[in-house]
Amino acid sequence: VSMNGNWYFHIPMTKNVSEEFSMDHVKHVVGIDRGIRFMITSYDEKGKVTFVSGKEIQKKREHFQQVRSELQSKGTKSAKRALKRISGRENRWMSDVNHQISKTLVTKYKAGTLFVLEDLKGVSFSDDLLGKRSAKDRQELRTWTFYQFEQDLTYKAQALGSQVLKVKPDY
């Protein structure tokens, strides 16, 4: 692949990872809460709390939304092409953010870590449940990439010999 005058060679590979994870071998337990104001808040067995601020992420997403809104109101052919480009750019950027955060967590705690996440399956951000929030807040909640972060953390943890456990959000 040629990009900006440089050539890159992509080599796909498969790594066999042991599916078995024994609770007897747990060295660390890390609870992770996902959110918008703070992308993640983690709490480990030593009582150390780590916050990853979502402020810069939120600003950049607002910028993408503003540009998207302006282009949609124009409605020209070139505006539609630009919208397609921006959409891909925002998705790639958000994927990279999730990748970096999950990679940092997994490398920080090493093998034998049990990451505990709240199970957001079935959680709905419908208008009924969101109440009297602004349209901006509703849109932000609906488009946040909670699941993608969970997927990134899960596969990276398993590759390193750790595990992700999902619990009910009530606890």
Predicted regions and their residues:
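Positively charged, helix-rich recognition surfaces that bind polyanionic ligands
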Residues: 3-171
